[in-house]
């Protein structure tokens, strides 16, 4: 399956406050939400996998209910990132990827979000990246890292990601400053909102500015994953649809 060069979606799709005509029609049953979402977007970031690992049958259902060219980004288990803190992870990683395997070619990327106040540990990051690049079910996948402590914003961390062709997740609206740093052949962008984390709307002007950045990344030959995580009040859906429209009108996608 050839993946699109620019994929725009939201962090999650199953939000009750998106119902009642915010995005989902009040007449649309919840069991059909994913199908409707996939009619409007090419990708979704699955956050549920961070909190609990769904059954293989659930991943298989997501695969069957979405179009051929649809792409999933799966958020890595917090057991691995927040409890194990990247150490001694061979078994939990194997378990995680075994469960996600029914997504097959639709598994576009895996996001590893590290916890706040977790300081940079070079050895842990290197060993974890080696595992990801050698385990049978993960070595061919795209991996992105969202650092939530500024100590990871360093040249040594970026060098390690570049060595393994893993992406530094560019996160806007988080508690950390936005850094535009490409470390792989793909871009992973998370838009959390501006002034209020998860609860700010991006203006059309701001979205046009993001579109220009995305166009630049695309022109350099990179695949770009964009996920809006400002889900409060339906801002994520609104902003994702607007950004997609802006880029389509400019023939960027």
Where are these regions (language model features)?
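Residues lining hydrophobic/aromatic ligand-binding pockets adjacent to catalytic sites
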Residues: 1-253
């Amino acid at each position: 399956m050839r993946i699109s060069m620019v994929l725009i979606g939201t962090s999650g799709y199953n939000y009750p406050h998106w119902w009642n005509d915010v995005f989902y029609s009040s007449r649309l049953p919840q069991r059909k939400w994913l199908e409707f979402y996939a009619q409007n977007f090419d990708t979704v970031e699955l956050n549920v996998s961070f909190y609990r690992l769904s059954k293989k049958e659930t991943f298989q259902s997501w695969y069957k209910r979405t179009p051929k060219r649809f792409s999933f980004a799966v958020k890595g288990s917090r057991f691995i990132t927040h409890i194990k803190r990247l150490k001694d992870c061979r078994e939990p990683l194997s378990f995680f990827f075994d469960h996600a395997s029914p997504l097959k070619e639709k598994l576009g990327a895996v996001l590893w979000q590290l916890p706040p106040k977790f300081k940079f540990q070079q050895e842990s990051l290197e060993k974890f990246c080696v595992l990801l690049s050698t385990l049978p079910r993960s070595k061919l996948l795209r991996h992105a890292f969202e650092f939530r402590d500024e100590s990871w914003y360093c040249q040594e961390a970026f060098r390690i990601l570049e060595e393994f062709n893993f992406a530094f997740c560019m996160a806007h609206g988080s508690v950390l400053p936005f850094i535009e740093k490409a470390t792989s052949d793909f871009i992973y962008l998370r838009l959390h909102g501006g002034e209020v984390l998860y609860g700010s709307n991006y203006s059309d002007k701001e979205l046009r500015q993001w579109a220009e950045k995305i166009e630049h990344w695309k022109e350099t030959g990179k695949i770009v994953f964009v996920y809006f995580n400002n889900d409060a009040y339906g801002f994520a859906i609104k902003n994702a649809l607007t950004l997609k429209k802006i880029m389509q009108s400019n023939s960027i996608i």
